[in-house]
A protein has these predicted regions:
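Structured secondary-structure scaffolds
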Residues: 2-49, 101-105, 155-370, 414-416
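N-terminal catalytic cores of NTP/NDP-binding nucleotidyl/phosphoryl-transfer enzymes
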Residues: 2-76, 95-111, 115, 132, ...
Length: 634
């Protein structure tokens, strides 16, 4: 017998800064569904997850709690593992970056990269965001705050070791271009290429001296290894990679990884930083990195003060494990963010699980017991409608496989539930209760119930990857296809008002003083204009190809802006917010048909669009996605 093909799947490791909410939990459930499905196809699956446990943020949180960082991460890692287990995830390895073998291997990897000239010592000066553990230049900040999370940043300067990213950039670009499946979805690949790789990579800071909670650089112990060479190496250390000798059999068997599942917010680290580290180590790159969308709270951002944070264990208490698994897997689009709320959970449970699935199984098992004492055989009394049910049943596994190969897990689940819906329609078409009234149609009735049991069983077997407990319960009720058990309710319908009342008892809203929202500004309204007035203005995307300060002015910059095939000179009062050097290369939004005028004696042929906050800070309006110079703004 030939060996089973291997399949190595990983999630990002969870940061141990606090209890994960349902949005954090989605990723592990998604990975589990894929891992289970691959096992059902005969793959030898190795599924790794774990926790990221070092960093300044954890050091500060431990200090606030009055405990050591290790005590702090032990508590949080234990809670994360408890929730992963609660969600019935079938991981094979749970790695912690505080594990001794991981820390030792990270030190060896750091030394190897240093010895071969990929890492060097220097100084880092910039703005630092503690929650994101990232440095930024002034020009990268958004309104003076972290461009990733929007929180305040602090100036920082420290000695650090750097990795020569540019040394491998061209090689990575070539790899991505020749391996279109490497970064998925395609929109994430385009983002990485256009926003990071093609503009050029800066060398990456890979050590810190301003905090101690990390893996020491053994040949320079005042430094600790920064997150990039720590957390991002777990995917190889967890399966026994050794950079200075023979790696373990588990690594040799499973590397390169077949699939890395990570959130879209950290795809840059996993598709640029980590592949370059692997190239430097002489290792092949993973076959695919999938940046999944986010699961968002239905009524806005999750906030403890509003009492609207959704945690997996609390959802499980209300709905059960498989109902929660079903929702997060079924409601997440392939690329766009999904939404979750108590109301949506109740609606989906009642509609899909209690009605479509639960009612189908209950009716089928009940009728089999009522009319045949729980035992049926195929009497072969067929009608045309049977052929369609059989065709749908046989085609569903093919459709599911196609969707799973594309990582369209929600669509795969839809195909399974389409089969269950077809079974319900089959009941309406064949009307077993009417057949039961005619003794001459007894064999036809038994054939109908036999067909139903076979089709539902086929769907239940497919459902195992997504809802393992429910699959097991259905197959147990349906027995071996001949003898069924007594019917049991799979999912109870819920009343939304009762659920919300219990939720309010569990999480009463916290009264807090109303504070001015710094992200909202009210300005005095101007008189309304007509569509005709607005239509007179022409807005286009422009690219700044040159910029210089306007002499004898403290406020003005003069930019040469390429708009389509023409270049316009535009003078703007933004000198206090941008340097001339920063402006060059920016894509901006331009009012192009503004009547030319002179500012400080310099001709200006248009206007750059900016936003201004309450403190007078300006930010240029730029396209959200790459757009060509000259593109119309409409």
């Amino acid at each position: 017998m030939a060996d089973k093909p291997k399949y190595y799947i990983t999630t990002a490791i969870a940061y141990t800064s606090g209890k994960p909410h349902i949005g954090n939990t989605y990723e592990i459930v998604l990975a589990d569904a894929i891992a289970r499905y691959k096992r059902s196809q005969g793959y030898d699956v190795f599924f790794q997850t774990g926790t990221d446990e070092h960093g300044q943020k954890i050091e500060l949180k431990a200090e606030e709690a009055g405990i050591t960082p290790k005590e702090y991460v032990d508590n949080v890692a234990g809670e994360i593992k408890r929730i992963w287990d609660l969600m019935n995830t079938s991981y094979d390895k749970f790695i912690r970056t505080t594990d001794d073998y991981h820390e030792k291997e990270v030190q060896k990897i750091f030394k190897k990269l240093y010895d071969q000239g990929d890492i060097y010592k220097g100084y880092y000066e910039g703005m630092y965001c503690t929650p994101c553990e990232s440095f930024f230049t002034e020009s990268q900040l958004v309104d003076g705050k972290c461009p990733d999370c929007g929180r305040p940043v602090q100036p920082a300067k420290e000695e650090a070791y750097f990795f020569k990213m540019s040394k491998y950039a061209d090689r990575l670009i070539d790899y991505i271009n020749t391996h279109p499946e490497f970064i998925q979805p395609v929109s994430r690949k385009n983002e990485m290429m256009n926003n990071f790789l093609l503009p050029g990579l800066q060398d990456l800071c890979v050590s810190r001296t301003s905090f101690k909670w990390g893996i020491p650089v053994d040949f320079d112990p005042k430094h600790v290894t920064y997150v990039w060479l720590d957390a991002l190496t777990n995917y190889i250390t967890g399966i026994g990679y050794h950079c200075d000798g023979e790696s373990e059999e588990l690594f040799n068997k499973n590397w390169p990884a077949d699939l890395h599942l990570i959130g879209k917010d950290i795809i840059r680290f996993h598709t640029i930083y980590r592949p370059i580290f692997l190239m430097a180590l002489g290792l092949p790159l993973p076959k695919q990195v999938f940046g999944h969308p986010w699961l968002l709270q239905g009524d806005g951002k999750m906030s403890k003060s509003k009492g609207n944070v959704l945690y997996a264990d609390e959802l499980v208490d209300f709905f059960g494990v498989d109902a929660v698994r079903y929702f997060v897997l079924h409601e997440m689009p392939f690329e766009n963010d999904g939404v979750i709320s108590w109301e949506l959970m109740v609606e989906r449970l009642n509609s899909d699980l209690a009605n479509t699935l639960g009612n189908l199984v209950n009716r089928t098992v009940s009728m089999t017991n009522k009319y045949f004492g729980g035992t049926v055989t195929n009497k072969g009394v067929t009608e045309e409608v049977d052929a369609d049910l059989k065709a749908v049943t046989e085609n569903t596994p093919v459709l599911v496989e196609k969707k799973m190969d594309e990582l369209r897990v929600a669509d795969a689940m839809t195909e399974i539930f389409n089969l269950f819906k077809r079974c319900n329609k089959y009941i309406d078409e064949t009307m077993p209760w009417a057949l039961a009234k005619d003794e001459a149609k007894k064999d036809r009735l038994e054939t109908v119930l036999w067909n139903l049991i076979q089709s539902i069983s086929a769907g239940a077997r497919l459902l195992e990857s997504f809802m393992p407990e429910t699959s097991e319960k259905i197959l147990a009720q349906l027995g071996d296809g001949h003898v069924v058990e007594k019917p049991e309710i799979l999912f109870q319908r819920l009343d939304i008002n009762e659920v919300l009342a219990k939720v309010e008892e569990l999480h009463p809203p916290v009264e807090e003083e109303k504070e001015e929202d710094e992200n909202v500004i009210d300005i005095e309204a101007k008189p309304e204009i007509t569509f005709e007035d607005f239509g007179k203005m022409q807005f286009q995307v422009g690219e700044i190809i040159a910029c210089e300060e306007v002499k004898k002015s403290k406020k003005l910059l003069c930019s040469q802006v390429k708009i389509g095939s023409q270049v316009k000179q535009i003078v703007s009062g933004i000198k206090a917010h941008y340097t001339a050097e920063e402006m060059v290369g920016k894509k901006v939004m331009v009012l192009v048909n503004l009547k030319p005028a002179k500012l400080a004696g310099v001709l200006s042929e248009g206007m750059l669009l900016c936003a201004e906050d309450a403190d007078g800070n300006l930010a240029l309006m730029t396209p959200e996605k790459p757009m060509p110079a000259g593109a119309e703004i409409c």
